[in-house]
Amino acid sequence: MKFKHTSVLLHETIDNLKPKNGGLYVDATFGGGGHAKYLLSKIETGTLVGFDQDEYAIKSAELNFADLLQPDSEPRLKLVHDNFSNLEQDLVKLGYSDGIDGIYYDLGVSSPQFDQADRGFSYRYNARLDMRMDQSQDTDAYQLVNTLSQKELADILYQYGDEKFSRQIAHRIVERRKDKPIVTTFELVDIIKEAIPAYARRTGGHPAKKSFQALRVAVNHELDVLQASLEEAIRILRPGGRISVITFQSHEDKIVKKIFKKYSEVEVPRGMPFVPDDMKPTLRLENRKPITASTSELENNNRSHSAKLRVAEKL
């Protein structure tokens, strides 16, 4: 499979990391390797470790970056087929236990995952309900849709997709599966359309968009994994090291903003004459407001419209 994908906020993400020769960097979401290729072009020496839980992305990278993966005294690129929640553990296995100089995340589903019909991510193609980033994972969208209670389904659709008709959709799903399991993406799309009022179906894009997003987030535990990974990444960053995070959904951005705030701001008790070392901030925000795509990128890459980039430096 060719894992072609147009990287969003390419220069902004990598340039803000300020990569330096000899550094150790982590691409937490390797995908098509666009950000990785640009970062490696900025340094003559140093190593990038690319993580991706998608087997197809790793196999594609092994072909497209074969010249950089050849073992030598100082490998330029190493690939890890794993979720970015296991950053430190996997880095130690590779022999990197002294921290990293930079890390970046490009969150969300990549274009090839949407375009590969049998992955079940998209409401545009008819396929078995799947939505697993990691194909070795047991739980998929089919299981959630056919086993969760009406309340659990409604909560997922509302919390992860901001779907205001979550209760109606969840009710219709539970009623339909009484007759037979809901197997395919198109079956689910039809159920969603039936549950949403006609006036709402005519506005705001595809009626199944929010529900499919919510199920994908739930299947892959995206928000829990993101929060745990960011905490770990900040801990293993060396002083002066930087972290860049691109988000596409409001709930993702809220998590990044909250964690960056937690480590960059200090609440000193009233009357305390100085700030103890264990209360001092460990991050400095590079940008108070998120960086967004330029006019040129917005015109050439539709995926960039909702992208937000936040950057911070380890103190």
From Swiss-Prot:
Gene Ontology MF terms in the entry: rRNA (cytosine-N4-)-methyltransferase activity
Binding residue positions for S-adenosyl-L-methionine: G33, G34, H35, D52, F84, D106, Q113
Annotated region (Disordered), positions in chain: 290-315
Top-level taxon of the source organism: Bacteria
Compartments, record wording: Cytoplasm
Keyword Flavoprotein set for record: no
Record keyword Transferase present: yes
Bias (Polar residues) ranges: 292-304
Primary enzyme class: transferase
Alphabetical keyword list: Cytoplasm, Methyltransferase, rRNA processing, S-adenosyl-L-methionine, Transferase
Catalysed reactions, as listed in the record: cytidine(1402) in 16S rRNA + S-adenosyl-L-methionine = N(4)-methylcytidine(1402) in 16S rRNA + S-adenosyl-L-homocysteine + H(+)
GO biological process: rRNA base methylation
Family annotation (Gene3D superfamilies): Putative methyltransferase TM0872, insert domain, Vaccinia Virus protein VP39
GO CC field: cytoplasm
Documented EC number(s): 2.1.1.199
Function statement: Specifically methylates the N4 position of cytidine in position 1402 (C1402) of 16S rRNA.
Protein family membership: Belongs to the methyltransferase superfamily. RsmH family.
NCBIfam families noted in UniProt: 16S rRNA (cytosine(1402)-N(4))-methyltransferase RsmH
Name of the protein in its database record: Ribosomal RNA small subunit methyltransferase H
Native source species: Lactobacillus helveticus (strain DPC 4571)
